[in-house]
Swiss-Prot record:
Localization terms from the record: Cell inner membrane
Membrane topology: Peripheral membrane protein
Protein name per Swiss-Prot or TrEMBL: Putative ABC transporter ATP-binding protein alr3946
Keyword Flavoprotein in annotation: no
Domain ABC transporter span(s) in chain numbering: 6-242
Top-level taxon of the source organism: Bacteria
Function: Probably part of an ABC transporter complex. Responsible for energy coupling to the transport system.
PROSITE patterns xref list: ABC_TRANSPORTER_1, ABC_TRANSPORTER_2
Length: 274
């Protein structure tokens, strides 16, 4: 049986000062060892779900579990949770807190009280892995958006989380920057980290993910393998998501039949687009 890292059980959440719930009894399990994607139109509750997963918010009803243990919201347990569950915001400005790149990456480690030698070793390794060595002493406000996103990713990964949450990681990046970031995410995944990524880029979701969650109005309405999710055209159209253009190509019979082997055709298209 597939083990889940993080489980939401009948979770409700309403922001203070509002009456409408953002999450409406959502139940969801994030499977260990998978590249997961979360899709849904704006306002469906994706970002709120991430904030609950990281312990930034606490459910008003329902429970959140880490490896079958209910989350505890005292300071000690939240610090432990945030080492295990890393969260990268869509806007990197929300989590860049120090003066230079090197200082920013070391910030979380210093808060953990690790020995200086360990901090230096981890920071040096992160600078190399995220191609930031030449930027180590540069002020973070002098960086490009793509560089800031890499720093925010390094900030989280230096803590060695088991689960990485990413809110629209490729938003506002050009194609080369997106490819570079996705290559880094693939390395992170291959090193053993489970990933859950929220994205409006349905082509990326179809190409990259092993498992897809579909949210609408604060609820989970579909989950499954990408090919199974995107076969549900009627449901996806009803919530204004539609299908990935690349998937539309795959299901166009006229194109598929031009290849003797439709699987070879699929691989060629994936290589071109992804």
């Amino acid at each position: 049986m597939q083990q889940s890292l993080l489980t939401f059980e009948q979770v409700y959440y309403t922001y203070p000062g509002t009456q409408q719930s953002v999450l409406n009894g959502i139940t969801l399990q994030i499977p260990q060892g998978k590249r997961c994607a979360l899709i849904g139109r704006n306002g469906c509750g994706k970002t709120t779900l991430f904030s609950l997963a990281n312990g930034l918010y606490k459910p008003q009803q329902g429970r959140v579990y880490w490896q079958e243990k209910a989350l505890q919201y005292d300071r000690k347990n939240l610090m432990q949770l945030r080492q295990k569950v890393g969260l990268v915001f869509q806007n990197p400005e929300q989590q860049l807190v120090a003066s230079t790149v090197e200082e920013d990456i070391s910030y979380g480690l210093c808060n953990l009280g690790l020995p200086i030698a360990d901090i230096q070793q981890r920071v040096t390794q992160a600078l190399v892995e995220f191609e930031l060595t030449e930027l180590a002493e540069r002020p973070v406000h002098h960086l490009s958006l793509g560089q800031k996103k890499r720093v925010s990713l390094a900030d989280v990964m230096v803590l060695r989380p088991e689960l990485l949450l990413l809110d629209e990681p490729t938003a506002y990046l050009d194609r080369p920057q997106s490819r570079n970031l996705m290559a880094m995410l693939n390395k992170i995944y291959k090193s053993g980290t489970t990933i859950l990524m929220a994205s409006h880029d349905l082509d990326l979701v179809y190409c990259w993910s092993d498992w897809v969650f579909v949210m609408d109005a604060g609820r989970l309405i579909l989950e499954g393998k990408p090919e199974d999710i995107f076969s549900q055209r009627e449901i996806l159209d009803s919530i204004e998501l539609g299908l990935p253009p690349i998937y539309e190509i795959f299901i166009t019979e006229e194109l598929a039949t031009k290849e003797h082997n439709s699987e070879n055709f699929r691989r060629r298209i994936l290589q071109f687009f992804c």
